[in-house]
From Swiss-Prot:
GO terms for biological process, alphabetical: leucyl-tRNA aminoacylation
Keywords: Aminoacyl-tRNA synthetase, ATP-binding, Cytoplasm, Ligase, Nucleotide-binding, Protein biosynthesis
Example GO molecular function: ATP binding
Motif ('KMSKS' region): 630-634
Intracellular or extracellular location(s): Cytoplasm
Family from the record: Belongs to the class-I aminoacyl-tRNA synthetase family.
Motif 'HIGH' region location, chain numbering: 43-53
Entry EC no(s): 6.1.1.4
Gene: leuS
The protein, known as: Leucine--tRNA ligase
Amino acid sequence: MTSERYNARDSEPRWQAAWDEKAIFVSKNDDSRPKYYVLEMFPYPSGRIHIGHVRNYTLGDVLARFMRAKGFNVLHPMGWDAFGLPAENAAIERKVAPKAWTYDNIAAMKKQLRSIGLSLDWSREIATCDPSYYKHQQKMFLDFLRAGLAEREKRKVNWDPVDMTVLANEQVIDGKGWRSGAIVEQREMNQWVFKITKYSQELLSALDTLDRWPDKVRLMQRNWIGRSEGLLVRFALDQATTPAGESELKIFTTRPDTLFGAKFMAISADHPLATAAAAKDPKLAEFIAEIKKIGTAQEIIDTAEKQGFDTGIRAIHPFDPSWKLPVYVANFVLMEYGTGAIFGCPAHDQRDLDFVNKYNLGNTPVVCPEGQDPKSFVITDTAYDGDGRMINSRFLDGMTIEQAKDEVAKRLESELRGNAPVGERQVNFRLRDWGISRQRYWGCPIPVIHCPTCDVVPVPDADLPVKLPDDATFDKPGNALDHHPTWKHVTCPQCGGKAQRETDTMDTFVDSSWYFARFTDPWNENAPTTPAVANRMLPIDQYIGGVEHAILHLLYSRFFTRAMKATGHVALDEPFAGMFTQGMVVHETYQKADGSYVQPAEVKIELGGNGRRATLLTTGEDIQIGAIEKMSKSKKNTVDPDDIIETYGADVARWFMLSDSPPDRDVIWSDERVQGASRFVQRLWRLVNDSVELGKAAPAARPASFGADATALRKAAHGALDKVTTEIERLHFNVCLAHIREFTNAFSEVLQRPGQPAADLAWAIREASQILVQLFSPMMPHLAEECWQVLGQKGLVSEANWPQIERDLLVEDSVTLVVQVNGKKRGEVTVATAAQNPEIEAAVLALDAVKLALDGKPVRKVIIVPKRIVNVVG
């Protein structure tokens, strides 16, 4: 038995260098083998990787190594999502240029990623801040512009007053900027937008084809796209109360059945009718100015107190000319959704009910639950939004909701006002066009020029890329490109007159919406993609990343791929065939008595009579053990990957990340379990070394036959191989590791038997050791390479083909059945797999436990559930 410990610090850099020297992870575009494209979402170069990165990239690496061993041409690239605000903040705070800060961070993080032992094709490395990348992004912007998929429009935007930039609705969290945390304001600005709404229905319908995506992600996208079927209704306005020139108010509703429960109309502060009314009412104008400050995001609207201002305007009910409804300007109605106007039916909408209760407008229920007396059915503080029959609705009374919807639609469609129907069935989507303009320096410049004579002029393709100036300064708030003395001043390419560059840069989500396509041929200097190559390598077979990107990044990428198809860059619609969302790495939090957090490395944990106790290492003071939460710098519950790799090695970190819980769930960091992973590494190392000694008696050729011991070991080895193969393909990595541990235990028991093994068993030991090393090689590649050499194998295990499963060995000779008497378990019986029912029955009835349970009673019948249970009924 070997007494030498496995030395990860010596082994891991050596094997990483060997992989690089042989370039075994470099994918060739002309490789004739079937392709497999695995990609983890590329990181932002913040300066250091965190432990979540280790988990994310290890998951993808296991799959990449496995598929390479299975004979695929694996594309497994890496790059950097390198534009963004932190670089500008660093420029301001640390007086360092964003470019220098970013590339220094890339170098540091690349070194860290290499230390994990990832099988990455670094020859395809890209950084989105490099002109060689964003040149092609600018080219596609111009292609989209020509195709009508990009345009400039004036629109209400979410303005972050701290970062001084526009935010998409998705980037506003609880009314605050997603990076700065500042309260978001509403402003009207010229914005460049991508016309994602042209694909609303297609993006929605295609979700049904993505059967290798998590259901929760598809549901989130469905909800965000937000398809709704309803009725556009034209309410006439009472001319005696309405500003000149206004005659009707259009609303879109998904509940036309509730029209007879209407108590008010509400319009957005940006609605033309509100503007017209405010022109003659200073108090209304003041109210509108106040509510505009809260922003345009739905999250803000939902949490704000419901406020309204009665304009004095009255709308006429479409089924009763004498019924007039007050028109309010309300802070919960957005111009961007529907028509910017609603009718309020408070009895059946909680928001509307809260509003009428505040302004004493009353409510009339028009849908009554089945079985309830309509006369006694009232609404007070809780709206009823369930099913039922129509009441208080004149000609609709007694109908179901769906019948009433259809009846209202038919009547209003047949009624004309000014040659147009009063009602029209429509489909609406919640999805809005993607505003990409950002008032920031460190982003991809938008390649257009503003000329006072020619208006907006695209930068000629020959002049791309439009590069960022390296000498920008950040001593003023706002966009450094605006402040630059020369960069924005140019000559118009059409008329030759003085003009200015667009100083907005693109939303960084644009950068990450097509990088996966660039990876297929990053050497093409003339076009974003080489279509023949991209069409062969795409879609990505397995994409891996956090669920926090389920809406923004994934939806934008799906749109971008369609836009690239429309402009000739790719030939597919969906970029990601398979999507996997990994869980987070979480950790306990630790706090002093004053509430301040301390790092795990500063805490000593002891087990006592009252459970776990934590103390501060430096002072011995008691520390409160808090909740298990997502790792964050603010709560100091982070673990530095470098420390773990330095102490235990990368393979231990990788094994722990894979073994503790299913990969789609959070994994709780545990020093004890990390130490357990380290012990398992040493155990494998000893086991492989021991197997070499015991395998020396093995004949060079495979024996013609195997005895019982050798057959049992071979069954265990090939059974483990079959299970691990299946579970890797299912991405059930924690289950794979459990099977490897199970086989390790069985193999260890064989190796510990006294004496020298017979020749056939020695051959089986040698085979089993090779299979074992290959089983854990995707998870612990450095240890596997070291063991591969110990076994005397040629080449690298990273180049070896995956072992072939001998399926004859998977057939069990016997099966163990649970034995019951009158439904209660009395024991077990093992019989031949091929045994017939009479043989099974005889074996069961011969058991002493069965005879004792029957206590002399006659057997009435024996029920046999094949390969599971035998129940004796007495």
